[in-house]
């Protein structure tokens, strides 16, 4: 990983990312109402109907990771998680919690009181706040397993990075009138751009692990968006996303998760190289 000078980040990447993320908000009014209460229900699971849905979701997500990663010791979680990823995870979680708070306040999405306990932290259900720590931890477990068993497929994948940037920027231009679509795309574009700037060698590995993550993401995100219940726990304002769903969740959620996870890994590498004695500043 090439570590750019602080001035490059300050004068190039940060303004570009801020403009991408912030421009759709200029003079834009969120359209009130229009929440999609029902998801595309695949099957009804009665035991999920109730205020413990989010808690069940977290337990089902965490227990397999705890068993395979910690009990069976599939990877060195003490170094991989506690030493390398814990601080970046917390930092990115705080950024995305702020995003969640803002969009909840603006009416981009809301939470169905029939499926939560009713205790809030900064106007978010406490279960939602926990999501930002539990789900990334579980997702990074998949990344670590792929890292150990698949030895960095596709390398830095620069061609793929450029192709994704072009395609996603085109989609961004077409969806600037939808706040969730625009911010999800702009966050993804910004993170891919940053991975190019720092010449991050782990992009191919991340893409491989993220593609695998889409499988459990369909199930666990579906639990929150009406795939297995009569109504959705997380209800989206239909005017603020593109209307395309994978199973029951908006496709924009993929960009949300992509930006969150790659941000953790980029920040982890940045901190690791900054603290090491052998990094090279690029002027």
Tell where the protein language model's regions lie, with residue ranges.
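Aromatic-rich, lipid-facing transmembrane alpha helices and their immediate juxtamembrane interface loops
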Residues: 2-283
């Amino acid at each position: 990983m090439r570590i750019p000078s602080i001035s490059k980040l300050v004068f190039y990447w940060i303004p570009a990312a801020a403009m991408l993320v912030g421009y759709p908000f200029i003079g834009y009014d969120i359209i009130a109402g229009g929440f999609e209460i029902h998801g595309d229900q695949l099957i009804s699971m009665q035991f999920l109907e109730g205020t413990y849905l989010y808690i069940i979701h977290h337990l089902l997500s965490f227990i397999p990771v705890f068993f395979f990663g910690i009990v069976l010791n599939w990877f060195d979680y003490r170094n991989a998680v506690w030493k390398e990823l814990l601080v970046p995870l917390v930092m990115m979680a705080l950024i995305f919690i702020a995003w969640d708070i803002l969009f909840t306040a603006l009416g981009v999405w809301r939470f169905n009181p029939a499926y939560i306990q009713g205790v809030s932290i900064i106007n978010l259900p406490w279960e939602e706040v926990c999501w930002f720590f539990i789900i990334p931890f579980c997702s990074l477990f998949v990344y670590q397993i792929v890292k150990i068993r698949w030895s960095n497929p596709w390398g830095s994948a620069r061609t793929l990075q450029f192709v994704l940037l072009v395609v996603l920027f085109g989609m961004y231009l077409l969806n600037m009138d939808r706040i969730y679509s625009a911010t999800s795309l702009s966050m993804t574009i910004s993170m891919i751009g940053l991975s190019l700037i720092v010449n991050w060698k782990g992009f191919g590995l991340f893409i491989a692990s993220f593609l695998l993550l889409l499988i459990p993401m369909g199930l666990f995100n579906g639990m929150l968006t009406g795939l297995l219940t009569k109504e959705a726990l997380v209800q989206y304002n239909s005017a603020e996303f593109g209307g395309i769903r994978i199973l029951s969740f908006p496709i924009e959620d993929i960009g949300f998760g992509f930006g969150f996870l790659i941000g953790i890994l980029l920040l982890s590498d940045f901190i690791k190289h900054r603290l090491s004695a052998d990094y090279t500043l690029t002027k």
